[in-house]
């Protein structure tokens, strides 16, 4: 089984997306909180993992994966036992629209997700 380490921040919308899929799939992972307010995402060791200076980063067997939606796609492909992605083509299209919307507007969606959560 792969060793998963998630570098993330609690209120970060992008981090929430990845944690949601990890929890839905019941995957065990090591949690490493990154303090964005203190600028921890700019530390030289973190930049080696994520040159974009953002969260989340998922390290899988020493390989760093970045970009929350792409991390979730990886998790769906690598751990297919519990499906997060619908198999119905129309529902899959709807899911992809929501992912695109959140990826495009996530700074504005953060407070909305907090209220809905």
Residue positions per predicted region:
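GST-like domain detector, emphasizing the conserved glutathione-binding G-site
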Residues: 1-117
């Amino acid at each position: 089984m792969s060793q998963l380490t998630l570098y993330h921040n609690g209120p970060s919308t992008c981090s929430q997306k990845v944690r949601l899929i990890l929890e839905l799939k019941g995957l065990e992972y090591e949690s490493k909180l990154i303090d964005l307010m203190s600028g921890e995402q700019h530390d030289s060791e973190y930049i080696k993992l994520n040159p974009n200076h953002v969260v989340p980063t998922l390290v899988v067997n020493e390989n760093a994966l970045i970009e929350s939606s792409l991390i979730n796609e990886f998790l769906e492909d690598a751990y297919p036992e519990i499906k997060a992605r619908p198999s119905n083509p129309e529902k899959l299209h709807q899911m992809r629209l929501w992912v695109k919307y959140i990826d495009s507007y996530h700074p504005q969606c953060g407070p909305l997700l907090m209220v809905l959560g």
